[in-house]
Structures are given as structure tokens and as C-alpha cells.
Amino acid sequence: MKIGTRWIERLMPPVVTGAVVMAIGLNLAPIAVKSVSASAFDSWMAVMTVLCIGLVAVFTRGMIQRLLILVGLIVACLLYGVMTNVLGLGKAVDFTLVSHAAWFGLPHFSTPAFNGQAMMLIAPVAVILVAENLGHLKAVAGMTGRNMDPYMGRAFVGDGLATMLSGSVGGSGVTTYAENIGVMAVTKVYSTLVFVAAAVIAMLLGFSPKFGALIHTIPAPVIGGASIVVFGLIAVAGARIWVQNRVDLSQNGNLIMVAVTLVLGAGDFALTLGGFTLGGIGTATFGAILLNALLSRRLVDVPPPEVVHQEP
């Protein structure tokens, strides 16, 4: 935090952060689409889920509207249950695992093991996560209209501490989740206290195998339909950054950088170096930074030409 965040601002101005945020949403899009492409019934159920969420978002008010993702999922699950368990149109929902799961159980913990080669392979990912975290903060700033720059250092430190804590008990590295940004965009709830409460509740539910089994019963087409909405909103958040910062996409440098970044992210372009593979979000992030540095140019104010009045 002592070295500040100005260097990040220079590397990732609004035109870059907007492109990265949009690339994140486009990179996640195939995951949602593939999860609902197993059959025609799954695809139509995904459409029904999108409609349920959309109807809740537009035609409800108050608390129901703020919980539109949850309410939309519940309505879509009920429709899925009627169509499958009652009408037999698709794969029925099976609650056997829920009935056999225990109410309380401890997760599996393991002590960390240090491997130099593995550490060298995973260390560069931290740089990607810094850029991705910055993009997430910019997206939140664009949605809320608040300057989040003073909190960047805290966000990076918190991200690092969370990863260290997770690794100390055998967990994987953690980062901020772009899906939550989409939920914020839909619900218009930006309070940090809400996310603290959600984190505590999530940790407590992690000790309940029955809840985990219940989550597994949510049909894949319903999850996929909700993901289409959420991932799309992430992409829109990137465009919102451009609009609010008045990014000039008529400049060829900006245009080329944005075009390449979006294709790298949407196409999940990967680069492999030895045993390390940089995925689509990483290549899009680094591509945006490098292209912006190479193609951007400072606009110099050119004084208007002097008008010379000639004597008749």
C-alpha cells in the first residue's frame, strides 16, 4: 500500500480496465452456454430461467427485486420440477443425496507442502490476479459512481492474506469473483456489510453436507440460465466504464487494443511456457496492458493556426 496505486493507473487506464472487465464476462460466457447445450430441453429451460430473472427484475419492487437472482432461481427450479418430476419431459430432480447427507460435518483439512517448481509455476498468476482484481474494482467503481482508488491497496492485501490462509489449510488460491459483480449490478446492493454477512453464512454452511447436497440438486440448465444473465452483466459493466470515463474509441490505438483484448478473452486464447499456461483472461489482461503501452500516444494540444489578414 505504501508504493501507491498510481503505477497501476498508468498501466491500466479506463480504456484498458473496461476492456479487461468486458473480456472477463465474454470469457465466462461459453461456460454458461455449454452447460445448457446438452439437449433441446436444457436450452429451453435456460431460456425460461432468463425470463424468470428478467420478469422479477422488471415487474417487482423492494426486497424481492433485490433478491431477483435467488427468486428467479427458485421459480425456475419449481418450473423445472413440474416439467420433469411431474410431466416427465426431462431428467428428474433426485433428492436422494439430500436425504442421506448429514446435517453437520467437518471439511477435509490438510497441511501445506512446499515445492519449489510448483511455486515458480504458480507465482506469475499473482500478477494476473492483481490486474484482474483491479478490473473488478474498476467495474464496481463504474457501477457505484464512487472512487475506489483509495481502497486498492486494501483489496490487494486482503486478497493475498486470504490466499495465504486458504493455502495453510490445504485450500486453493482465492481471488475476487467476477460473478459477484454481476449480482451487484442486478440487485443494486453495494454494501460491504452484505458481503461480510454472506461470507460468514457461506463458511457456516460449509460445515453442513446436507446444504451442499441441496445445492447439487439445482438443475444445470437453471444454473446455466442464471449464469447467462450474470456473465452478460459483467461484460456490460466494462462498457459502462468506457461510457462514464468518456473513452474515445475513435482513436485507432484504443480501437485496436479493445478489439484484440475482447477476442483474446472471448476466444480463451492461451499461451504455454514450459509447464505454465496463461488462460484467456490472463492473455487478455496482459495483451491490453502491452497494446495500450505500445499504441497509446499522448494528445498534444496544437494551437489553432493564426489568421493573417491581408490588406486589400
Residue ranges and their predicted role:
Residues D42-V50, L67-L68, L106-H136:
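Hydrophobic, membrane-embedded alpha-helices of multi-pass small-molecule transporters
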Residues P14, S43-W44, T111-M119, M148-A155, ...:
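Membrane-interfacial loop-to-helix junctions in multi-pass transporters
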Residues G4-W7, P112, V186:
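Juxtamembrane loop-transmembrane helix junctions in multi-pass integral membrane proteins
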Residues L51-F59, L67, L87, D94-S99, ...:
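Juxtamembrane interface elements at the cytosolic ends of transmembrane helices
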